[in-house]
Every structure is written in C-alpha cells, then in structure tokens.
Amino acid sequence: MQTEEKQMKMSYLIKRFVPYFKKYKWILILDLICASLTTVCELVFPMLVRYITNMGINNIAGLTVGIILKIGLFYLILRIIDSAANFYMADTGHIMGAKIETDMRRDLFAHLETLSHSYFAEHKVGQIMARITSDLFDITEFAHHCPEEFFIAALKIIVSFIILCGVNVPLTVIVFASLPLIFCFVKFFNTRMRKAFKKQRNQIGEINSQVEDTLLGIRVVKSFATEELEAEKFEDGNKKFLDTKKLGYFYMAGFQTSNRAFEGVMYLIVVVAGALFMINGKISPADLTAYLLYVSTLLATLRTIIQFTEQFQRGMTGIERFLEIMDAPAEITEKENADELKNVQGNITFENVGFHYSDDDTNVLSNINLNIKKGDSVALVGPSGGGKTTLCNLIPRFYDVTEGRILIDGKDIKNVTLNSLRNSIGVVQQDVYLFSGTVFENIAYGLSGATREDVINAAKLAGAHEFISNLENGYDTYVGERGVKLSGGQKQRISIARVFLKNPPILILDEATSALDNESEKIVQDSLEKLAKGRTVFTIAHRLTTIRNANMILVLTENGIEEQGTHQELIDKKGLYYNLYSMY
C-alpha cells in the first residue's frame, strides 16, 4: 500500500470512481433533474420579491389581492415540487450511494481473495479491515451528494450570474471578480485536509490491528499479567489518532473561518457598492433587494460547498485507500483458456524448481528435482528455514516458482485452473483455522452441497464422531471464533474430517500434530494414516518417528536438498538425518 506521503491525483480517483455510477445512471439522471427543479424553485423566489417590490413602489394600485393570491399559489406549487424533488434526492439518492458502497465493498473483497499469501504477510489485517469497512462508510454520502451538490452549485452560479448581469452588470463584475479568491482558499486547505484525513484512516487501521492482536492473544496477555502494557499500547495509538483528528480540525477551522470572512466581505461589497449605485440612480431599490437575495443564495451555495468539503475529502480518502488495494496486483493468476485438472492420479514432478520471495532475491529453494509417483508418501524434514513449508506451498500455487516448473500428471500447474488444482489438494495444517459457526458447517466447508450423512461419515473416518456426539448440541454446536470452545485435538480432527469430505488425491500435512499432547497426537495420527491411504502425501514432520514408513524422505537445509532416501537408507548413511533422528 502507498505511504501516506504519496497521494493519488484527484483526477485519477474520480476517473476510477465514476464507472460505479454506470449501473445507476437513470437514478443519477433523475436525481440531477430533481436537483435542477429545487434550484429553479429557489431562484424564482427573489424574482417574485422583486416583482412585488417594484409594484409596491411604482404601481401600488395595480397590486391587487387577486395578483397577490396568484403569486402565492404559484409559489406554493413551486414549494410542493421542491419538496417532492427533495424527497427523491434524500431517499433514492442515498440508496444509490449505499448500493455503490456495496458494489465497491464486493469488488474489494473479491480482489482480496485473488491476492497471494505474500500480500497478507506484508499487510496488517486491521488495516485491511479498516479499508473494507469504515473507509467505505463515507462512500454512501459521497456518491450521493458529490454529483448532486456540484451540479446544483454549478447551476446556481451560472443562473445567478445571468440574472445578476440582467439586474446590474457593473455590480455583478465586482462580485464575481472576487470569487477566484475563495477557490484559492479551497485549493490550499483541501490538499492539507485530505492528508490529515488519510492520516486518520491509517491510524484507525493501526488501532484496529492493535486491538485485534490483543484480543486474539488475550490468554497470553492474562497469563503474563500484561494488561497494563497492552492498555499503554492502546492509549499510545489512541492518542496518535486524536492528534491526527486535531490536525484535521485545525485545517477545517481555518477553512471555515476564511470562508466566513470572505462571505462577510462579499455582503459588505454588495451593500456598499449597491447603495452607491442606488443613490446615483444606477439601480432601483427593488433591484437591489432582489440582488441581495440572489447574492445570499449564491453565498449559501458556496457555504454548502464549503460544508461539503469535509465530506468530499473523507470520500476521496476512502476511494484512495480502496484503490490502493484494488491496484495491488494479483501475483497468482490463471492463463487465459487454462485447462481443467481432471481425474488426478497424483503423479508430481519438480523440474529444476527454484523460488525466492518477491522482496528478497535470495533463493529459498534451488534446483529441486523430484519425481513422485501416485500414492507415494514424501516426508520433509530439516532445520527451520530450510524451505519445507515453502516447497509444499508451491504445489497448490500459494506461491509461484521463480525457476523451473511443477507438473501434476504431466501438466504444468501454471496451465490449469486454480480451482481445479486446489480442489485436487487437501491441506492439514498445524495451526487449525475453524470459522465461526457450527461443527457441521466447519466440516461441510470441505465440500459444497455436502449432506449431513456425508459430514457424519467424514467425522467417523477422522475419529471425530464420538467427541462431536458428546457435545451439548452435537454437530450443531457453535465452535466460537476460531474454534475457541474446542481443544487443539478436537479442532485438528474437525479439520481432518473436512479434508476427508473433500477427498483429494494429493495431501499436504504441515506439522499437523506438532502442537498436540501425546494422547491427542496418537488419535490424530491414526486419523491421518487413514486419510493418507491411496493418496500422494507430503508430510512436514517434527517428530521423525512418524515418518519411518515414507517412500521418500527429503532433508532440506538452507543449501537445498541435503539428503534424500528412505528411512533406512538415511540412517545407514549416518548424515544429517541420522543426527536428527538420534535426538528423539
């Protein structure tokens, strides 16, 4: 994401935002028609006052009750039209804004799902959450009011200029000659307000991240009695947010004060210059009255724009932060007309595979060549940082190889669709993630349209049915956020049941039992052995006693594949694997 010092050009933001109106163009057109009606209704009033005043001064006898009632009825009709138009703008216009906000949030979420693991490793979840939720809140008001307010303002300024010129050209030239001054103020303060609002958004994202971090680690916080430390961290972030708010309000105050001063000067110019013109016979009292009313309308329009400026800048800031994610490239993409990976057997080939992360040119893996047959069991062992998890992450294309290629059943995985590739691979991780919901929903997540019978059968295969049946509501038991109501072993068995239900031909076991106690590990290990039957399996192991029966064991270090062979071959070799195994 861009730093707060870098700002997208406003023209670019508007260009990217405008297409969201396309679906709602008729609503927008009607909204602008209604805006035109309200503007006309407002601008007619000074003309009526001018007419009545002129009649009162020059032809009081001609100003009959009938004429007054007709004028009153005419104005009443205008106000009814104005009220109906305002209702449409306030109701349907706001709904249009809300729909645009919804569309943008949908697009943002869809794009987030296309981004690679590296993006989420580099950006805080709290910041992302702020962008997909609070940053788009102001879009509703912005999408509704932005075209409407600027259209009304432009219309009022143009019509007012024409009418005022019709009343008195010299006075109008004086009034409008001073308008560029206000636009200079607008430009000066707008730039600074937008920077301040972006700092606010960034800081609230930091607060979200800090709160999320504390709440997710609340057990650690309580076990170390560090509530005060966390409170201090929160207070520090909260104070920084307050400071950014103060900065924003400082510029807002300067902006509003400057404009109130400008408004006062405008009235002063009209009153003094108008009075001088009047005593010299260059403008009539009725015309000066109407002129003052039009100037009042003009200044009210400018005041509305000024008041809208804060909302405008908040909206532009929200759009900018929205686009910062939308413009993040999806590193893992499908080729056009990619093939479906069908009837997968599970033969996997690594051809001269190398990999390094996008922010570091140092290879994590180099010259990896493997030929794994259907149903083979491959174990990966070695010290941390050797690339075991990275190698496994390349198979479902969580990351893409930077050198060489990987083939499944002879097909380059870059030439097949991501869905068909990932549907062929099941992953059981050490850090199990369960979604908020029931046990049934979490297991059924493994297969779209799974029946209750399917879920129960998968749970039985995973050795989870018995403990699930003993839960208060069985399969309908709510597991809590991230499965907090279940033990580590229970969560792991549910995740294994999920993979049983998916029934993939290729399986990746990423230290699936490393965080479990001995009793839970034995139960889960039995489930994993059932799951592995008939599949091509990659196992990242921390306890080497669990991989003795693997067809192939790879010992990975920072230098690549240090050793390769069966358990007995590596023991006989008395190398690194022998030393690691001897430690258990």
Show where each model-derived region lies.
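Short intracellular "coupling" helices and adjacent cytoplasmic loop segments at the cytosolic face
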Residues: 2-6, 98, 106-136, 209-233, ...
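Juxtamembrane loop-to-helix connectors within ABC transporter transmembrane domains
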Residues: 12-13, 21, 89, 93-97, ...
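An intracellular "coupling" helix at the cytosolic face of ABC transporter transmembrane type-1 domains
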Residues: 25-26, 117-118, 134-143, 147, ...
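Alpha-helical transmembrane segments of multi-pass membrane proteins
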Residues: 33-34, 78-97, 148-155, 176-200, ...
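ABC-type nucleotide-binding domain
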Residues: 341-584
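Transmembrane helix-loop-helix hairpins at lipid-water interfaces of multipass membrane proteins
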Residues: 28-88, 165-170, 281-285
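Hydrophobic alpha-helical transmembrane segments of ABC transporter permease domains
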Residues: 33, 41, 45, 85, ...
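Helix-loop-helix
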Residues: 57-60, 64-70, 163-180, 247-320, ...
